[in-house]
A protein has these predicted regions:
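FNR-like FAD-binding dehydrogenase module
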Residues: 1-418
């Protein structure tokens, strides 16, 4: 199979001026983060010019608005509503417009921007408040600043990857403690506007926890690398993800959920990729915890295109299988994995082939690792597709997405923005 790619010739890249905007460092989520930062910088300039910069009430309100932006943009019901709206866009619209709308999942950049600016405003508030508020409120602001510093330090990408459990505990329990301190300081300050904003963000944050449930599951292990989880509860929308946990106050992890054809419930594939997943596979539970609702995934935005190519590696087949079975958009599947039958089981491979008889399954044990950009382009060209959707690890996803977009081909892929 490798010999096929030697004849694939990639077209010329876009001119440098257009190509630079396709670089991963300038992806839409990063641009949105920058937009929030610049907007706050302008607001700061206006505040200094008009003399309200030193007002504790004003700065506290701006800080809370930034945090509200960061929280609401990730609210599950908002995410699903936005995705549903984009999915209804007529496919007759110009490709450039649909390509832009398909990047709707990059709105997570607003979450990052709101969190960054909200933190900076609160740190500034702690300094500004000196001499303007009583000792009790000043102590509350200092505690907020210290807690924000701890959350920021544990949220750094490298730390988050190496110490995920600590990051998650700090983000959750630190966030709850911070919310309590926000309420204490807002009541002490007596600002009605700040209390209104805080009420909205608190309700948004608590809503998923009101839907906390413990549900029974069946777990099958076709190999030591993967566990296939199924449940007959809560049939989700195709292409969505669901947060699960073995204990409600410990680690939560999100996985793509696959509706079971002709039956209630869902399935998910969990591959060995760390301590939590390894323990899950080696010690499968009889029940898991779920909270909130299943949330629309990145690949749902591919519904705006007339035909797509899915380029998938390994257990990335999980989130893509839901779209294969839903069959909302004509597609070509390219699945690159080691010995698919041995790793994922004959039943899953047969299910994929029934739904996608022309699927390209590249066995890396037999054929080695392919040039993913050439493989993606070959499938894109031969299938007359409009876009490529890649579901893989971070490095490979960005390689394929960037490789396609610098050729002028629409491409989507996870962005790991938080």
């Amino acid at each position: 199979m490798s010999a096929v790619l030697t004849h694939v010739q990639l077209p010329d890249e876009l001119p440098a001026a257009r190509r630079i905007l396709k670089h991963p460092r300038l992806m839409q989520s990063h641009r949105l983060t920058l937009l929030v930062v610049l907007t706050n910088a302008v607001l700061l300039g206006v505040g200094i010019g008009n003399g309200w910069w030193g007002s504790v009430v004003n700065v506290a309100l701006i800080a809370q608005i930034n945090f509200a932006l960061g929280i609401l943009i990730r609210q599950q019901f908002f995410v699903n509503a936005l995705c549903t709206l984009v999915m209804r866009v007529p496919k007759s619209w110009p490709l450039k417009i649909r390509w832009t709308l398909a990047k709707g999942y990059h709105l997570g950049g607003l979450h990052v921007g709101g969190a960054i600016c909200g933190t900076l405003w609160f740190w500034a508030l702690t300094v500004i408040a000196i001499g303007q508020v009583d000792a009790g409120l000043q102590v509350t602001y200092c505690l907020q600043s210290l807690l924000l510093f701890a959350i920021v330090m544990t949220s750094r990408p490298k730390f988050r990857t190496e110490h995920h459990d600590l990051f998650e505990r700090m983000h959750r329990f630190g966030g709850w403690a911070l919310s309590a301190l926000f309420w204490i300081s807002a009541i002490q300050l007596g600002s009605a506007s700040t209390i209104v904003v805080l009420t909205i963000t608190t309700v948004s944050s608590l809503l998923p926890w009101t839907l906390l449930r413990r549900i029974p599951v069946d777990v099958i292990r076709p190999s030591s690398h993967v566990a296939l989880v199924s449940s007959n509860r809560y049939r989700p929308m195709a292409g969505s993800t669901r947060s699960i946990a073995r204990h409600p106050f410990k680690q939560w992890h999100s996985f793509a959920v696959i509706p079971t054809p002709g039956a209630p419930g869902f399935r998910m594939a969990i591959s060995r990729a760390g301590d939590w997943t390894s323990y899950f596979i080696d010690n499968p539970p009889s029940h898991i915890w779920v909270r909130g609702i299943a949330t629309a995934g990145m690949a749902n935005y591919g519904s705006v295109f007339n035909r797509v190519v899915y380029v998938v590696t390994g257990s990335g087949i999980g989130p893509v299988l839901a779209h294969i079975l839903a069959n909302r958009v004509p597609m070509q599947l390219v699945w690159v994995t080691r010995n698919p039958v041995k790793t994922y089981g004959q039943a899953l491979v047969d299910e994929i082939m029934r739904a996608q008889p022309d699927a390209i399954i590249w066995d890396t044990d037999a054929d080695g690792k392919p040039d993913m950009v050439k493989l993606a382009y070959s499938a894109y060209e031969s299938s007359n597709a409009e876009a490529v959707i890649c579901v893989s690890n971070r490095k490979l996803t960005w390689t394929v997405v960037h490789g396609m977009e610098k050729l002028g081909i629409p491409a989507l892929g996870p962005i790991w923005d938080s």
